[in-house]
Amino acid sequence: SILINEPGSVTISSVISNNISCAGSSDGSIDISASGGTGLLSYSWSNGETTEDISNLSFGEYSLIVTDANNCIANDTTTINPVPILSITLDSKSDQTNCSPYNGSINITANGGTGPYSYSWSNGETTEDIMGLEANTYILYLSDINNCSIQDTFTINSITVPILVLLDTSNYNGYSISCNGNSD
């Protein structure tokens, strides 16, 4: 009797993808573990790479075919997800008025990227919104947990509020008018 052992099939047992850290970057990676089959395994990725693991990837879909010496195959597809673009939205801004010094404010919202966010204003503040501002230009440096960063500039203007002064410029010979139509 002759015993013929069938070779084990090629299997991809683990796929670990690391998404890109910042919008527009190419620092994603895919690590796989393949085994089985006969002889050495070869790797063919949809982006042309021929190694088991691939790196320096931008967002998108990547397909892999693993082939053994007998041309038996296993395949898998993995996605590197995009990261929303980091942005700053100005919600409201109040200019400084002459009625009260240092009463300007800037209220913003951070969007995109990967939170939590870090705020660094040119006046030393580290909060999302700032207040008690004098007329000046303020720069916000915003970064996310992956150290992706952007900056934006906001200007607080000085608004002169008219001051109403009431002066009585009429001379009534020391008397005030008592009734409409009277000539006192």
Name these PLM-found stretches.
Residues 1-184:
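Proline- and Ser/Thr-rich low-complexity, intrinsically disordered segments
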